[in-house]
Amino acid sequence: MVESQKAMPQPKMGRIRRIHFVGIGGVGMCGIAEVLLNLGYEVSGSDLKASPVTERLESFGAEIFVGHRAENAASADVLVVSSAINPANPEVATALERRIPVVPRAEMLAELMRYRHGVAVAGTHGKTTTTSLLASVFAAGGLDPTFVIGGRLTAAGTNAQLGTSRYLIAEADESDASFLHLQPMVAVVTNIDADHMATYEGDFNKLKKTFVEFLHNLPFYGLAVMCLDDPVVREILPQVKRPTVTYGFSEEADIRAINVRQQGMQTHFTVLRRDCEPLEVSVNMPGNHNVLNALATIAIATDEGISDEAIVQGLSGFQGVGRRFQVYGELPVEGGSVMLVDDYGHHPTEVAAVIKAVRGGWPSRRLVIVYQPHRYSRTRDLYDDFVQVLGDANVLLLMEVYPAGEEPIPGADSRQLCHSIRQRGKLDPIYIERGAELAPLVKPLLRAGDILICQGAGDVGGLAPQLMKSPLFAGAKQEKSK
């Protein structure tokens, strides 16, 4: 705990002392739990299995239960749940029966934000990276923010941290429209794309209106930071009745990038800002999508008065986020090695951005993708887009869809995706049976100099470390921490 934090007004939730998280190991839950622990609250939580995340929280004083049972919630003053938790969960049912409040995670995050200068990052893609860049730049500027991020910040070794300043930087989740609970001082919209459409009853106009509603949670003196390159963000811009700053590659943007040069993992560019000197910037991430994430960060940092030196330092010193084009190391193959990358991208737009980044940074190298679709409903709704974008790999291995609690949907599985991609005639995908070991399947396909990406939001995230430890890749070299 940080001693100087005493000077900062803290959430005082009346009679609430013990806070119980149902699904505490989830990426959106554990960060809030960690901040509350550091604020002195009693925290307990349950999850289906123990993990490094739950072990970390336990080391900080949280009481962790493996499995969901009614008695786990018996002594709680409030339950925090994510949208992934079934209302029939025994802990939730017990809390409702005993009139213990049950609140969504975003409502608890909003309570933390209510006492601070909140910076909320929304958008279909780029939230985690942008939030992480903001935390890095604010720290470089001496502002020591509290942050809650949807991925593990490499430099901090965690996805949440209690800071000593008035700033709280967090992701704003549109997937279940829970970002409407938040009332930040600054809000970013990186882009708006068709995803989680069941929340919006399949109505894209409803999704757009919800983003506008979110921005109108800003006070009249707040700031909306919006990506002008995204056509949907540009479309809703006239509807936003709050002060705005735009960013992008567009010449009309208030903050824009020119002279972009990518050299492997590094991207260099010049930033033009109204009434400011041009700024030369480098980030240790490939791709124009990450330039846009950096521009959003620069827009907010400039508005908050952070010096150019701190902005440059915070961006160049940024060490990345877990599973966002995370380089694990080099796998030995005949004649050389293969660069192994782990990535969370699970939407066609995200897959396309990663492929473009690889082609830009390593134009002569083959791209081998092991991809796992996430949710049958997303695969169905974006089927043609997946066929188009995945067909741009040089070699493609498709794992079966990660269901995330959904029942299979006919025609929306990986076998069908393989068939449709094969029909395009560009490449012949390999279907990976559920539970099959990857190393013996992928090794014969690899050539020296290849880039191998394990991509998706499901259990594909465990494959990169498995490959590094596989006897078939004895002598694999771990990526050194920057």
Swiss-Prot record:
Pfam families given in the database record: Mur_ligase (PF01225), Mur_ligase_C (PF02875), Mur_ligase_M (PF08245)
Q: Which reaction does it catalyse?
A: UDP-N-acetyl-alpha-D-muramate + L-alanine + ATP = UDP-N-acetyl-alpha-D-muramoyl-L-alanine + ADP + phosphate + H(+)
Q: Name one GO molecular function term.
A: UDP-N-acetylmuramate-L-alanine ligase activity
Q: What are the entry keywords?
A: ATP-binding, Cell cycle, Cell division, Cell shape, Cell wall biogenesis/degradation, Cytoplasm, Ligase, Nucleotide-binding, Peptidoglycan synthesis
Please name the InterPro entries in this protein's record: Mur-like_cat_sf, Mur_ligase_C, Mur_ligase_C_dom_sf, Mur_ligase_cen, Mur_ligase_N, MurCDEF_pg_biosynth, UDP-N-AcMur_Ala_ligase_MurC
Residues recorded as binding ATP, renumbered to this chain, are G123, T124, H125, G126, K127, T128, T129
Signal sequence bounds? none
Which residues form each disulfide bond in the chain?
A: none
EC number annotated for this UniProt entry: 6.3.2.8
Q: Which GO terms describe its biological process?
A: cell division; cell wall organization; peptidoglycan biosynthetic process; regulation of cell shape
Q: What is its main location?
A: cytoplasm
One CC-aspect GO term: cytoplasm
Q: Where, per UniProt, does this protein localize?
A: Cytoplasm
Q: Which family does it belong to?
A: Belongs to the MurCDEF family.
Which NCBIfam families does this entry report, sorted A to Z?
murC
Provide the function of this protein. Cell wall formation.
Q: What is this protein called?
A: UDP-N-acetylmuramate--L-alanine ligase
Provide the species name. Pseudomonas entomophila (strain L48)
